[in-house]
Amino acid sequence: MVVFTGSTVEEAIQKGLKELDIPRMKAHIKVISREKKGFLGLFGKKPAQVDIEAISETTVVKANQQVVKGVPKKINDLNEPVKTVSEETVDLGHVVDAIKKIEEEGQGISDEVKAEILKHERHASTILEETGHIEILNELQIEEAMREEAGADDLETEQDQAESQELEDLGLKVETNFDIEQVATEVMAYVQTIIDDMDVEATLSNDYNRRSINLQIDTNEPGRIIGYHGKVLKALQLLAQNYLYNRYSRTFYVTINVNDYVEHRAEVLQTYAQKLATRVLEEGRSHKTDPMSNSERKIIHRIISRMDGVTSYSEGDEPNRYVVVDTE
C-alpha cells in the first residue's frame, strides 16, 4: 500500500499520480481519510490520505468495458442483463400488443423492424425506442395500471394471469398493491447506499409520475458518480432499474440525473449529431459514434431523422453499441 497526503483529496491524488508517473485511468485509488480543517483552522488539522496502486493494462481494458474504477464491485460486475427465454417471451408479448396499437392508429412498422423483433436480433423494446414508438409501449403499461386502480380483479384476462404466474416462476417477487411514493423512497435509499459505499458525499431527491421515477443527485464530486463517458451513471441506473424489476411485477421506469449532467449531455449530443451529419454529407461516407447508452443513441437518431440527406442506425452489442450515420 502506497499512501499519499495532501491538503485535499484531489491534491493527494495528483501527488500520487505524479510520483508513480501513471495516468489516472491506470490507477486504483482508495480514499483512506478526508482532510480535517481543525479548530479555527489550527488545532487538530489533518491532511487527506489516499492509497494509490498502479493496475495492469488488462484490468484497465476490463474496467473500461464495464464501468470505471473506484466503484463498488456490484457495479463493476454489472452488465446488460441477459434475458431467459421466458423473460423474452413476456417482453415480446408487450411489444406485439404495442405494434398492434401502432398499426391500428395508422402508423406503419416496417417489415424489417418486425423481422428483427421476431428473430430476437435485438431487444424488442430497444428497437421500438430507437424507431420512436416506445411511447406506445409505455401507454399500454399505464393503461394496465389504470385498469388495476379501477378494479382490475374483474377485468384481468387469462393472458394477464399467465404472465403473472410466469413472473413468479422466474423467482420474481410479485407486488400487486404498491404506493408510488414508497417505491420512489425505496429505490432512492438503495442508490444512496451505493453512493455511500463509493465514499461520495451527495444529496438525493426524487419526483415521480405514475410509474416514472426521477432521482436527482446533487454533489460536489459529480465526476465520480458520472464516470468516464457517463459509465458509472449508466451502471447506477441499471442497478436501480434492476432493483425495481426484481421487486415489482409491473414495470417502473427510473432515471437518474447528477447535478445538470443529463441536460448538458443532451445539448452536447445534439451539437455532436449535427456536426457528424454535416461531415457525412461533405465526405459522402458513413461515420460512427463512440459506444453510447440507449438513451443517448435515441437522441442521435432523433436529431438525424430531422435532417435531409442522412440516416442513422445502431450497430454492435451492449455495452459497446454505437450509432452509424450515413447518406440516404
Swiss-Prot record:
Posttranslational modification: Phosphorylated on Thr-89 by StkP; there is another phosphorylated Thr residue in the protein, which is more strongly phosphorylated in strain R6 than in Rx1. Dephosphorylated by PhpP. Phosphorylation is increased in an R6 strain with a C-terminal MreC deletion.
GO BP of this protein: cell wall organization; peptidoglycan biosynthetic process; regulation of cell shape
Phenotype reported upon loss of the gene: Grows more slowly with a longer lag phase and decreased final density compared to wild-type. Cells are significantly smaller. Suppresses deletions of PBP2b (penA). Double penA-khpB or rodA-khpB deletions partially alleviate the slow growth phenotype of the single deletion. KhpA is no longer targeted to midcell.
Keywords tagged on the record: Cell shape, Cell wall biogenesis/degradation, Chaperone, Cytoplasm, Phosphoprotein, RNA-binding
Record's keyword annotation contains Cytoplasm: yes
Subcellular location: Cytoplasm
Residue ranges of the region described as Jag_N domain: 3-53
Record's keyword annotation contains Chaperone: yes
Record text about domains: Has an N-terminal Jag-N, a linker with a phosphorylated Thr, and 2 RNA-binding domains (KH and R3H). A phosphomimetic mutation and mutations that prevent nucleic acid binding are not tolerated in strain R6. The KH domain of this protein interacts with KhpA. The Jag-N domain is responsible for targeting to the midcell.
Function, as annotated: A probable RNA chaperone. Forms a complex with KhpA which binds to cellular RNA and controls its expression. Plays a role in peptidoglycan (PG) homeostasis and cell length regulation.
UniProt name for this protein: RNA-binding protein KhpB
Species of the source: Streptococcus pneumoniae (strain ATCC BAA-255 / R6)
